[in-house]
Amino acid sequence: MNIILFGPPGAGKGTQAKYLVEKINGFQDSTGDMLRDEINKNSEIGKKIINDMNDGKFVSDEIVNELIKKVIFDEKYKNKLIFDGYPRSLEQAKNLETILESSNQKIDYIFFLNVQKEVIIKRVEKRKTLEKRSDDDSNIILKRYDTYMDMTRPVLDFYSKNSNFYEIDGALKIEQIPAKIDAFLNV
C-alpha cells in the first residue's frame, strides 16, 4: 500500500506519516528528511537545496524526482511507502504516476491535510522551541506557505478527482487526526 500525505509546511505531515508507518508497517518517504540529509552530507545537491530553502523557495522538481525515484525502485520499500511532502507540483505528481506504473505500483490513498496559514505560524513558533530546523523561521515559513498554496492548486485539482482522495482538517489536535485517517483506510 502506497499513501500520499500532502499539505502546507507545518501541516503535520511528518507526524501523521510516522503514525501510518506503524499502522501499515510501511516506510516514511519524507522529502524534507531526504533534502536535509543531502544538506548534512554537504553534497553539491545539498548546497543547492540549502540556498533554495533559505530563500523560501522549493527545491527543483529535477532534484526531488531523482531522490524519490531511488526510493521507489528499492525493493524493500515496494508498496509500503508513505510519501510525506511529495508531490508538490503537477510535474512531480505526473512523474510519481509514471515511476509507480513502471514499477508495477500505485497510490492507494491520498490524504490532504488542509491547514490555514495562522495555524501553521503558531505550530512553527511552538516547534522552534522543541527542535532546531533551519527552515523554521516565521518569514521563511510564510513565504513557503504562499508558494506552496500557489504551486499545489494544480496538484489538488489533479488528485481531488480520484476516489481515493481525502481532505482532512489538519487544524485538529494531533491526536484527533489518526482517527480521521483510520476512517478512510481499509486496513
Protein language model features and the residues they cover:
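Glycine-rich phosphate-binding loop of ATP-dependent small-molecule kinases
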Residues: 1-187
